[in-house]
């Protein structure tokens, strides 16, 4: 007897946060395109044994929240259970402390108000800290496109003790 295999990866398993309206819509469109492409690869690789549910008409496209990731509660925007296996991937904005706009400085203040010298942090440090809070004690990992400055100079003493204090494992 021949068994048919269905793909187990669904768009409903994808979550994200995007600030810009156009980028938010592009993220949703990109998920639909990626699903279509991966379903085709899945079916082609398994020949007559693989199936994927049709994606037309377009329905759910993941859970992409339009909002400011620095101010949202990630566990509400991207719910997680203890049994979940989660990967956070991103390309957050790098903006040095002297090039930040007032709104970005306010974002830093909201996240790091308990730190004396939070104003000297790079903007991207918010994503590192919030992701460490999010993955703490869970089966989760995060990876970001970043600059090496997050691990050099004054950033090290300002940011990393607080991330290490969350007892997360860091891989390089």
Predicted regions and their residues:
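SAM-dependent methyltransferase catalytic region
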Residues: 1-172
């Amino acid at each position: 007897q021949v068994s048919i295999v269905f793909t187990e990866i669904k768009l409903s398993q994808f979550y994200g946060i995007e600030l810009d309206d156009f980028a938010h819509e592009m993220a949703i469109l990109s998920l639909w395109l990626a699903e279509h492409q991966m379903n085709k690869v899945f079916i082609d690789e398994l020949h007559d044994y693989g199936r994927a549910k049709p994606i037309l008409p377009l329905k759910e496209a993941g859970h992409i929240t339009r909002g400011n990731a620095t101010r949202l509660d990630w566990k509400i925007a991207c719910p997680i259970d203890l049994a979940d296996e989660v990967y956070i991937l991103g390309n957050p904005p790098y903006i040095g402390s002297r090039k930040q706009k007032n709104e970005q400085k306010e974002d830093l203040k909201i996240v790091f108000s308990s730190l004396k010298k939070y104003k000297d942090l790079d903007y991207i440090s918010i994503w590192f800290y919030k992701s460490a809070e999010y993955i703490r004690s869970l089966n989760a990992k995060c990876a970001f496109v970043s600059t090496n400055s997050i691990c050099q100079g004054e950033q090290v003493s300002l940011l990393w003790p607080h991330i290490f204090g969350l007892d997360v494992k860091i891989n390089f």
